[in-house]
């Protein structure tokens, strides 16, 4: 199970991020499953090492344009590229009418069979090897989160042990591999479980966007190997998240923590956090890691292979986690989301988290000019601050004694 992010921006594309789409490559089947298909997804596929001829299933979360406007172009291109295998598309109730209208008014004829499935909470697809389930999330329109679960694989069969005991090669080995008990002609019986290692747990991936924090996302993501969750807003803009029914970075982290997932990828970032703006996606990462340390930032064309051992893939470079000295326990951080509020006037707040503060926050709370704030930001990017004495030595113009500085 190999994940490739094709679009990680929300609403509109930016210079470095396209709108939503994630590819799940299944090498053993030579198949690609897509999750959402925002505008220009087929362009992203051309820039990747993925082959459109291997696309077999497309799962649409909801009917907003930044998640579906690339679908029809991709389906048409698959046909022009010579695809003849059936493509199955899954999504909300209005998806079939949308596709039918586009096919009709563009006079598009596909050379392959296109099957559209209307999803409901529960099992969406299963073939014995993989099972896809979905849950209804909490957004302005019906939106579904998807979970792909791989079936458990039998443990290694120790053929040398069977040979040493004189068990004849043939169909009996197949029965032993399945854990069955066999009886030989000489009357000896053998339990197949004695010849096999424990089964290998199947891997799982969960994709949740668009949604505000909700219990169904937590239930869907229970103990998943990878959770891909939207983080449209920073924590300081939680009021916007609640108003627009999107998630903050901390909401995504809370879902990951409650669900006890192995690894969280943040995606679906607002364009307001693009390079050059006061708040960066790295600030959202720091917010999330304070709650759930095993958090990574998704970026276009980032590739991640889910390992079979349930551990975080060694190929992923470690990310610096912000110091969380102010957090005694995980439970202390996971307060009820309904009770969270955003300070109306941030400059009156008594504390500043120096390793996560934005330039505007530093200007307001520290009473410094933009040049000094940028200098602190630049030094922080190179090496995070660890003590108050270091700040007092580097920036004596700030009255640090009047502030409650958190690291």
UniProtKB/Swiss-Prot annotation:
Cofactor stoichiometry and binding? Answer: Binds 2 Zn(2+) ions.
Judged by the first EC level, this protein's enzyme class is: hydrolase
Indicate which residues the UniProt annotation says bind Zn(2+) 1. Answer: 62, 64, 139, 210
* Keyword tRNA processing assigned: yes
Q: List ligand-binding residues for Zn(2+) 2.
A: 66-67, 210, 268
Q: What is a GO molecular function of this protein?
A: zinc ion binding
Give the UniProt keywords, A-Z: Endonuclease, Hydrolase, Metal-binding, Nuclease, tRNA processing, Zinc
Q: Which cofactor does it need?
A: Zn(2+)
SUPFAM superfamilies for the chain = Metallo-hydrolase/oxidoreductase, RuvA domain 2-like
Q: Which HAMAP family match?
A: RNase_Z_BN (MF_01818)
Family, as annotated? Belongs to the RNase Z family.
NCBIfam families, alphabetized: PRK00055.1-3 (NF000801), RNase_Z (TIGR02651)
Name of the featured protein: Ribonuclease Z
**What organism does this protein naturally occur in?**
Thermosynechococcus vestitus (strain NIES-2133 / IAM M-273 / BP-1)
Classification from the root reads: Bacteria, Bacillati, Cyanobacteriota, Cyanophyceae, Acaryochloridales
């Amino acid at each position: 199970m190999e994940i490739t992010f094709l679009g990680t921006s929300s609403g509109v594309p930016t210079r470095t991020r396209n709108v939503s789409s994630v590819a799940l490559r299944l090498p053993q089947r030579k198949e690609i499953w897509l999750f959402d298909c925002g505008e220009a997804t087929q362009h992203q596929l051309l820039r990747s090492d993925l082959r459109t001829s291997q696309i077999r299933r497309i799962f649409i979360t909801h009917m907003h344009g930044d998640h579906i406007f690339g679908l029809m172009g991709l389906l048409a291109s698959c046909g022009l590229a010579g695809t003849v295998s059936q493509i199955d598309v899954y999504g909300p109730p209005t998806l079939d009418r949308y596709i039918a209208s586009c096919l009709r008014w563009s006079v598009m004829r596909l050379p392959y069979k296109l099957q559209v499935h209307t999803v409901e909470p529960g099992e969406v697809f299963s073939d014995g090897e993989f099972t896809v389930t979905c849950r209804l999330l909490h957004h302005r329109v019906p939106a579904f989160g998807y979970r792909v679960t791989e079936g458990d694989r039998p443990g290694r069969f120790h053929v040398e042990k069977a040979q040493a005991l004189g068990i004849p090669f043939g169909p009996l080995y197949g029965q032993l591999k399945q854990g069955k008990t066999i009886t030989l002609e000489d009357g000896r019986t053998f339990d197949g479980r004695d010849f096999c290692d424990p089964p290998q747990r199947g891997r799982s991936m969960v994709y949740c966007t668009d949604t505000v924090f909700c219990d169904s996302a937590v239930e869907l993501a229970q103990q998943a190997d990878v959770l891909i969750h939207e983080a449209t807003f920073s924590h300081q803009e939680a009021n916007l998240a609640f108003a627009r029914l999107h998630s903050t970075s901390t909401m995504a982290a809370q879902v990951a923590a409650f669900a006890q997932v192995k690894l969280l990828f943040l995606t679906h970032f607002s364009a307001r956090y693009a390079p050059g703006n006061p708040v960066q996606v790295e600030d959202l990462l720091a917010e999330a890691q304070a709650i759930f340390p095993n958090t990574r930032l998704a970026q276009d064309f980032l590739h991640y292979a889910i390992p079979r051992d349930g551990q975080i893939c060694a190929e992923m470079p470690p990310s610096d986690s912000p110091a969380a000295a102010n957090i005694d326990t995980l439970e202390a951080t996971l307060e009820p989301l309904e009770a969270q509020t955003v300070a109306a006037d941030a400059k009156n707040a008594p504390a500043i988290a120096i390793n996560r503060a934005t330039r505007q926050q530093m200007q307001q709370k520290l009473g410094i000019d933009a040049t000094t704030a940028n200098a602190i930001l630049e030094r922080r990017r190179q090496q995070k601050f660890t003590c108050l004495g270091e700040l007092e030595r580097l920036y004596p113009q700030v009255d640090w004694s009047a502030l409650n500085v958190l690291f």
